[in-house]
């Protein structure tokens, strides 16, 4: 049996308890591996949830710093196996997911990334990591995020905690994907090994705050040593994120905030895309 660690970050609240146990079950059901489950708890942790979880074959670590990135980084520092994975507390590993990933590790591979199934409202869509991603992962990332929480397996001595600590809120796995494509050897396996529940109630990506996190997160991506053509594509996404934040603030009745975001979009290289919005916003932006 091959040892592997799976990190499950969670706030361990009663609202997440059922899906958290579902995630744990999906790891314990893995064949041909010996999984160690590290549950990294932080935030509004519920003592009852933790007590019931402690009755299962998991190791619970408490992170004093709030936030997803901090919880994962804290747990990565405790990994003592050659390989580790991360799994969000509302997602599931598919059967034989870990064995399939381990089978693809050659000595020169730092990360194995697989396809995954995205589930929204009971409708499943396979997110592929086929030839387009394999041929140019940086460009592919500007079109669709090919790395999801839970779709990768990492070599511990190559991918350390600082990668996860640096992940910006709202764009964690996209940012990590860029970093991996820039600096590490990735093996892509175009076989789904993860069921990603994109519509779990309370998920941060479904909250309006997620929109307002995008500009800062994309700004962090822009600080990476991206090739010129990729840099231009990310700059375009950055400008679009500023505009989206402006629109959302306006719809919420926050005219001054809408103007602040809009003015920032006009300071980008793609200002001309949003200039006409100025005349529309002007008579409607009084708080």
Label each region the model flagged.
Residues 1-26:
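N-proximal low-complexity "stem/linker" segments adjacent to membrane-targeting elements
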Residues 25-34:
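Short, acidic, metal-binding catalytic loop of nucleotide-sugar glycosyltransferases
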Residues 34-44, 61-64:
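Short beta-strand/loop segment that forms part of the nucleotide-sugar
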Residues 55-58, 65-70, 98-159:
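Flexible acidic/His/Gly-enriched loops in nucleotide-sugar-dependent glycosyltransferase catalytic domains
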Residues 63-79:
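Glycine-rich, basic loop-to-helix element that forms the pyrophosphate-binding segment
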Residues 84:
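Short aromatic/hydrophobic "clamp" motif used to bind/position activated sugar donors
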Residues 133-209:
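Conserved nucleotide-sugar donor-binding catalytic segment
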Residues 141, 192, 196-199, 205-232, ...:
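Catalytic core of nucleotide-sugar-dependent glycosyltransferases
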């Amino acid at each position: 049996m091959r040892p592997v660690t799976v990190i499950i970050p969670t706030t361990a609240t009663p609202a997440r308890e059922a899906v958290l146990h579902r995630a744990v079950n999906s790891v314990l059901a893995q064949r041909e591996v010996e999984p160690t489950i590290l549950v990294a708890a932080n935030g509004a942790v519920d003592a009852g949830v933790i007590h019931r979880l402690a009755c299962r074959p998991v190791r619970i670590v408490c992170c004093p710093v709030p936030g997803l990135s901090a919880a994962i980084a804290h747990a990565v520092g405790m990994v003592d196996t050659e390989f580790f994975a991360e799994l969000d507390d509302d997602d599931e590993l598919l059967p034989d997911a870990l064995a399939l990933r381990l089978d693809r590790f050659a000595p020169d591979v730092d990360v194995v990334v697989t396809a995954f199934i995205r589930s929204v409202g009971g409708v499943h869509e396979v997110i592929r990591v086929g030839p387009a991603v394999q041929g140019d992962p940086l460009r592919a990332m500007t079109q669709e995020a090919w790395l999801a929480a839970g779709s990768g397996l990492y070599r511990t001595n190559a991918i350390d905690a600082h990668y996860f600590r640096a992940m910006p809120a709202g764009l964690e796995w996209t940012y990590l994907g860029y970093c991996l494509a820039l600096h590490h050897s990735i093996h892509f396996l175009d076989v789904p090994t993860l069921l990603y529940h994109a519509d779990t109630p309370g998920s941060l990506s479904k909250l309006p705050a997620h929109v307002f996190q995008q500009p800062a997160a994309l700004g962090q991506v822009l600080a990476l040593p991206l090739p010129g053509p990729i840099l231009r594509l990310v700059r375009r996404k950055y400008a679009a994120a500023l505009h989206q934040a402006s629109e959302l603030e306006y719809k919420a009745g926050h005219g001054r905030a809408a103007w602040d975001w809009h003015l920032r979009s006009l300071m980008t290289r793609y200002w001309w895309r949003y200039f006409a919005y100025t005349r529309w916003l002007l008579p409607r932006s009084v708080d």
